[in-house]
Amino acid sequence: EEIKVFAKHNCGVAHCPTSNMRLASGIAPIKEYRAAGVNVGLGVDGSASNDGSHLLAEVRNAMLVSRVKEGLTGYSLSNDPNRKLMTAREALYLGTRGGAAVLGRTDIGSLEVGKCADFFAVRLNQLGFAGMHDPVSAVVFGQPVRVDYTVVNGKFVVREGQLATVDEGRLIERHNKAAKRLLAG
């Protein structure tokens, strides 16, 4: 019923799989939302329920949780190899174009002429990617990596794996001091 209401009123859903797992909030019906035409994007929630705030981890967890949900119905690749499971590309879609659709933004979500130049890049010449045949699957199925480059609106914010717009060491120092003050009351 809820899914029909979302679709009827053009509501979008921010799926936060890591937060849902941490809080035991259940498994969102992403396959059903998408089949009904509901826009689904990914979120990291907040530090109260997701300390990592790593969008690639959310992409991976969205895919894996959707597969766990299918498994809870008794499905297994070994008993039905033709059943449709969320793919790495579909999960990456949720973290890019899906998020843009939820926000009603047509200027982000994909690399196209006239859109904001927002993208990330990962060097694939690492041991964790050795033998890969599909770079998207390698990045999504593998352990979440620290990206080598991130560009937001045409400007580098991560370069060679380091924040390019702030002094990362100073930021960590300030963050740790603030956390100690909060804990001290």
Each language-model region and where it sits:
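Acidic, glycine-rich loop-and-beta core segments that form the ion-binding/anion-interacting portion
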Residues: 1-14, 20-21
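C-terminal cap of metal-dependent C-N hydrolases
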Residues: 116-172
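C-terminal active-site-proximal or functional interface alpha/beta core segments in diverse enzymes
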Residues: 16-27, 52
